[in-house]
Design a protein with these regions (language model features):
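Conserved loop->alpha-helix
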Residues: 1-193
């Protein structure tokens, strides 16, 4: 589990394929990597991945076809900036909302408005996902816990403050950019339990 508060920005150093498995090499600060060990879970742009190898400031992760089909990983190239968060430990504070690292779908940026050092970003998740969105609720965007603004069917707006833009890759979003989306898990459970 994760808090949705990005702890560091990483950079994709290499991407390799072996059969259906894609291996990511991610560079981060040594301050971020120093306490990690093989087998630990790390959210990479909100995707829960298992650390398979660590070398100083480098981390290695494997992604399987199911993960590749639902996330941005398949579109990564060398130099891509990714949001990083280690998994929560007992007694850690939760500054955002609990996220699982299991991405539901990807959305695309429909509009970006700049307001001084802040930005309003409109994201289209698709009409089928509209039932998981409600104003002032939470959503995970590339692993960031964000409060939802206005909603129209499967399209929503988020208001991003300067600190969020400084600390995450959301500042790099432009029209047409793709993002990983994780909807509020409590809403997912409610809809799963509804009679059909």
């Amino acid at each position: 589990m994760f808090s949705g508060i990005v702890q560091s920005l990483g950079t994709i150093i290499s991407i390799s394929e072996a059969g259906e498995i894609v291996t990511l090499e991610v560079q981060a600060t040594e301050d971020f990597t120093k306490d990690l060990k093989v087998g630990d879970s790390v959210a990479v742009d909100g995707v829960c991945l298992t650390l398979t190898k660590s070398e100083s400031d480098r981390m290695f992760f494997d992604a399987v076809p199911e993960t590749l089909s639902k996330t941005l990983i398949k579109s990564y190239t060398k130099g891509t900036k990714v949001n990083l968060e280690p998994s929560l430990k007992f007694n850690d504070s939760v500054g955002g909302h609990i996220v699982s690292g299991h991405i539901h779908t990807t959305g695309h940026v429909n509009q970006v408005e700049i307001h001084g050092d802040a930005k309003d970003i409109v994201i289209d998740a698709g009409a089928d996902w509209g039932k998981f969105l409600f104003e002032k609720g939470y959503i995970g965007i590339n692993g960031c816990s964000i409060t939802l603004g206005e909603i129209t069917e499967g399209r929503f707006i988020v208001h991003l403050i300067p600190e969020t833009l400084r600390a995450t890759n959301l500042d790099n979003l432009v029209y047409g950019s793709q993002v990983n989306l994780e909807f509020d898990q409590s809403l997912s459970l409610i809809h799963i339990s509804e009679p059909t």
